[in-house]
Regions:
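Acidic/His-rich active-site region of diverse nucleotide-sugar glycosyltransferases
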Residues: 91-112, 121
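Glycine-rich, basic loop-to-helix element that forms the pyrophosphate-binding segment
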Residues: 32-50
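Hydrophobic/aromatic residue at the end of a short beta strand that borders the catalytic acidic motif
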Residues: 58, 64-69, 91, 147, ...
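Conserved nucleotide-sugar donor-binding catalytic segment
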Residues: 111-200
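Conserved donor NDP-sugar-binding/catalytic core segment of glycosyltransferases
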Residues: 68-101
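Short alpha-helix within the catalytic core of nucleotide-sugar-dependent glycosyltransferases
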Residues: 13-14, 43, 52, 66-78
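Short aromatic/hydrophobic "clamp" motif used to bind/position activated sugar donors
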Residues: 55
Length: 211
């Protein structure tokens, strides 16, 4: 497990250092730069020499739904022959109790609808997993919103994205969580960013089709 500790000030750094010393399977990375957003932290981890063939998301507040989550994701890569896999998640409170809107599976996004259907939804789902050699060529944008969505659209332009509709991930929300109750201005800014990402991707696909 690679943990990018983006200059934490709440005791996380000290705790991770102790854990990494006790278990070498935990790789504790602290960026040299101070300007990295979530996308930049992804890039730091993916380019690390100990990053394996597949890079799988695990946000700091969230948990995999079972001990077989990673095995299911790797199996999906092998069986579906894809460059990225997106699973299904359950919204919960911090005590793991289900909360609305419940299960998020994006069943409207199917292979039968075609890869362009990803342009019509406002998110790809979770957890997200990548084939590392490709992701190293397509760094995520250094943002803290929509960074994986942007890269997922770029990947789906040329490569298959596999889907898993079984629940793999618990997305936990706690009171005061930055994603739980955003101001309308922030919601609008986030939506504008994704609109721009979709526009850029649509233009790129049109240009590709004209070649």
């Amino acid at each position: 497990m690679i943990v990018v500790d983006n200059h934490s000030s709440d005791g996380t750094t000290e705790l991770l250092a102790q854990m990494a010393e006790a278990d070498t399977r935990l790789v504790h990375l602290i960026p040299e730069r101070n300007d990295l957003c979530i996308g930049g932290c992804w890039n730091l981890a993916v380019h690390h020499e100990l990053c394996g063939e597949f890079a799988v998301q695990l946000d700091s507040d969230d948990v995999y739904s079972g001990p077989d989550t990673l095995a299911k994701i790797v199996a999906a890569f092998r069986e579906q022959k894809c460059a990225m896999v997106v699973g299904t998640y359950q919204m919960t409170d911090f005590q793991m109790n289900p909360i609305p809107p419940g299960v998020i599976d994006h069943k409207e996004w199917t292979e039968g609808n075609g890869r362009n259907n990803a342009l019509r939804i406002n998110g790809l789902g979770a957890p997200r997993a990548f084939w590392t050699p490709l992701l190293r060529k397509l760094d995520l944008p250094n943002t803290s919103y929509g960074e994986v969505y942007a890269r997922g659209l770029r990947i789906s332009r040329e490569y298959r994205i596999g889907r898993i509709y079984d629940g793999l991930y618990c997305c936990r929300r706690w009171e005061g969580n930055s994603d739980a109750a955003l101001e309308i201005e922030k919601v609008n800014a986030n939506n504008l960013y994704k609109d721009r990402v979709r526009t850029w991707e649509l233009e790129a696909r049109i240009a590709l089709n004209r070649k």
